[in-house]
Amino acid sequence: MASSQPPLPPPPPPLLLLALLLLLKVSDTSSSVSTATSTASETDNLTSKPLTSSFSSSSPTVWEKQTSQEKPETASTSHPDSSSSESTISHSPSNSGTTSTTQPTSSQPEPDTHPSSGSPSSEHTVTSPSLGSVSLATLPWSPTHPKPSTGPPSVSLATTDRTFETSGYAPGDSGVPRLHRNPGVVVAVCLLVSALLIGGAIMAVRRCHNGVSEFQKLDEGLVSRRSSSAHHTLP
């Protein structure tokens, strides 16, 4: 009797083999990417810690230097906001120059309204930044008056004096330049005007006398002619 052998199983198709190989490769790449991201996050944490610590340690010294250089002033401003958050700045006049600031928590710019001194209805609005900046103080000017200069007062006074000297306008004048009068020139002009007036009067008198003399001559001639004609008619 011939020995019966079991039939051999059919070989797996090549498509299944390719699918298995692709799955293995994808799993390897995903594991490598996850390890790379974890190492990158660790390095970021390590580098960010010393930076934040150094910034926090250096910021108080800079703030102290700025406050020590500033002059002691007293000013306070309040800005209304929709979320009822306030921003105040107070400078206490002390030798140490300590200041306390409270910044608003909203991220939108806050309007600062200031009524003008000239008209009660007109308002001057100024938008101040929300975070990381100091809010503006109360503006002392109105739309009808010019904006005050931000430079030192000595420089502004010098510039105004120079402008008055170059343009010839005085601070109280209404726009008419001053004329520097020389007394000698004024006297000469007065003498010329008086001489012209006197000469004109003399010429007018002479012309009047000339006219009268001519009329007299004509009258005398007519009288002599009449007398001569009368003498001729008498004999």
UniProtKB/Swiss-Prot annotation:
Alphabetized UniProt keyword annotations: Glycoprotein, Membrane, Signal, Transmembrane, Transmembrane helix
Subcellular location: Membrane
N-terminal signal peptide: 1-31
Topology feature Extracellular, residues: 32-184
GO cellular component: membrane
Sugar-bearing residue positions: N45
Highest taxon listed in the record's lineage: Eukaryota
Bias (Polar residues) ranges: 114-136
Membrane association type: Single-pass type I membrane protein
Tissue-wise expression: Highly expressed in large intestine, small intestine, rumen, and kidney tissues.
Transmembrane segment boundaries: 185-205
Bias (Low complexity): 28-61, 76-110
Transferase as UniProt keyword: no
Region (Disordered) residue spans: 28-159
Cytoplasmic-facing ranges: 206-235
Name used for this protein in its record: Protein CIST1
